[in-house]
């Protein structure tokens, strides 16, 4: 299994496990909603329950909003590009010979050089006329090898699934960091496929070099679920040096994510039937006191995860 696939499997497993724990917490606390609405918060346990429920609802809402934004952005992108679609020139037909891409390449009239793989169940490759005009035949074929890798792996669909979990599980910020590694590693593996198919690094490196001056001008939207040929420093370094990428997870995110899940499990235990055992403890450690620590961890993880989710938006607006 390749590193990107392992990262995706870990991300998916962590996301499903986290979802199960947080869903159990939500179901445990849900019966208190009617009581809170009827009589208000009477003690610290009620306050914690209300705040945790609010965090859960925010996570569900954020995940659904992210999913629908991605779907809507993809639909709008496709609609806009279809209106600019032109016939494939002989240069593209020659470059795609033997790649099993018949009927799956779209060429759009656009002054920005870009290429990307899009759509879910049956992915397609989109090229711009500016890209085709700038690249030599061997460079264009290397780009098609790169995008074909994404197409065969159905990477746009994987991106949608991963981004949904990263947004919905914002109280587990390490999921978002795994998503970032998975996305970059996928690009690196697509590069490696293009290099192998081209018999060397020269063709793909030439294409990336020609795209580099336009890297800041090409934007396909904040949450568009496509796999685009983006030029990044990490990819160029890997292409030149051949050094594998390291999984750079923030220690703070790892600690907060683990703490948040442990805290959620403790809250489930305290509120889900184990509270009788906790009530025998001294007052400092009794049930209301036990709720404060885990809830504080959840809130800290939520703040860190929320900052992770806002980072792409702030970079897009102010970067």
PLM regions: where:
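Polar-ligand-bearing catalytic/cofactor-coordination segments
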Residues: 1-7, 68-159, 177-249, 307-319
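Substrate-binding clefts and substrate-entry loops adjacent to catalytic sites
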Residues: 171-177
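Basic, amphipathic juxtamembrane/active-site segments
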Residues: 158-167
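Hydrophobic or amphipathic, alpha-helical segments that drive membrane association/targeting
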Residues: 1-107, 246-319
């Amino acid at each position: 299994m390749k590193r990107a696939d392992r990262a995706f499997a870990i991300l998916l497993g962590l996301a499903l496990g986290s979802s199960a724990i947080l869903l159990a917490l939500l179901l445990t606390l849900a019966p208190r909603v009617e009581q809170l609405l009827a009589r208000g918060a009477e003690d610290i346990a009620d306050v914690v329950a209300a705040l945790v429920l609010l965090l859960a609802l925010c996570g569900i809402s954020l995940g659904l909003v992210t999913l629908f934004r991605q779907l809507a952005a993809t639909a709008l992108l496709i609609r806009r590009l279809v209106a600019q679609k032109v016939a494939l020139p002989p240069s593209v037909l020659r470059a795609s010979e033997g790649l099993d891409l018949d009927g799956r390449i779209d060429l759009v009239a656009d002054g920005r050089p870009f290429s990307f793989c899009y759509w879910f169940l049956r992915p397609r490759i989109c090229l711009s006329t500016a890209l085709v005009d700038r690249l030599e035949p061997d460079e264009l074929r290397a780009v098609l090898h790169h995008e074909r890798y994404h197409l065969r792996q159905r990477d746009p669909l994987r991106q949608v699934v991963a981004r949904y979990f990263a947004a919905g599980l914002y109280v587990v910020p390490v999921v978002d960091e795994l998503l970032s590694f998975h996305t970059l590693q996928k690009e690196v593996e697509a590069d490696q496929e293009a290099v192998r198919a081209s018999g060397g690094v020269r063709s793909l490196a030439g294409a990336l070099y020609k795209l580099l001056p336009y890297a800041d001008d090409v934007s396909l939207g904040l949450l568009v679920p496509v796999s685009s040929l983006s030029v990044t420093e990490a990819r160029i370094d890997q292409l030149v040096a051949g050094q594998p990428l390291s999984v750079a997870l923030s220690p703070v995110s790892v600690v907060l994510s683990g703490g948040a899940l442990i805290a959620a499990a403790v809250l489930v235990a305290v509120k889900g039937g184990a509270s009788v055992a906790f009530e025998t403890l001294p007052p400092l450690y009794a049930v209301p006191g036990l709720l404060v620590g885990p809830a504080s961890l959840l809130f800290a993880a939520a703040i860190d995860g929320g900052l992770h989710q806002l980072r792409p938006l702030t970079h897009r607006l102010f970067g």
